[in-house]
Amino acid sequence: NASKITVSEIIAEISDPAIKQMFAQQYSEEAVTPDMYFGGVVENRPKLQQAYNNYFMENKLDAIVVPTTPIPARSRLLSDVNKSVELNGREADTFRTYTRNVSAASNVGLPALSIPAGLTGAGLPVGIEFVGERSQDMKLLSIGKAFESCRPDLPAPTMNRSPLRVD
């Protein structure tokens, strides 16, 4: 690929300060080195995979069920896009808060399925995530389909056509 765009130029265009900082840190001098990353993958990932395998077997589970996010969605009004969120009474990084529940399964290679579960009193969506055993994708899809057949229909989202970025 002969792209003339640099990683620094891409990072400069990220509008959310928290996400911009996260990407900048990944490419800074303090970033995890390839050797450190490889060591973590080789040493720690198999341990985490085994912990998940044990949890499924010891508890005779077909799936682990968690909220997709630890807090409900928030309004994407332009005025609050870059603010932090409150989690357990404390200010927390928006991106990390909203991705923390869904990261674990993907990091260990487990199939996961996030499905809209309902709406808050304010009409904002909440989701539920089903995490399956390794190589049990079809079983997980069946579980998701069964859940969807029991869940009441949800209204279509209202689309906010306001720009999310201010230049």
Please report, for each region that a protein language model flagged, where it lies by residue.
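Short helix-loop capping/hinge segments that flank enzyme active sites or metal/cofactor-binding pockets
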Residues: 1-53, 67-71, 76, 116-117, ...
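A short, structure-level motif marking secondary-structure boundaries and short turns
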Residues: 36-38, 85-88, 129
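A generic secondary-structure micro-motif detector
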Residues: 41-42, 90-91, 133
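Generic recognition of flexible, low-complexity loop/linker segments
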Residues: 50-55, 100-102
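Active-site charged/polar residues at nucleotide-handling catalytic sites that mediate phosphoryl
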Residues: 59
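Conserved acidic residues
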Residues: 62
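Short, surface-exposed loop/helix-turn segments at secondary-structure junctions
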Residues: 74-99
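Structural helix-boundary/capping segments
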Residues: 94, 101, 106-167
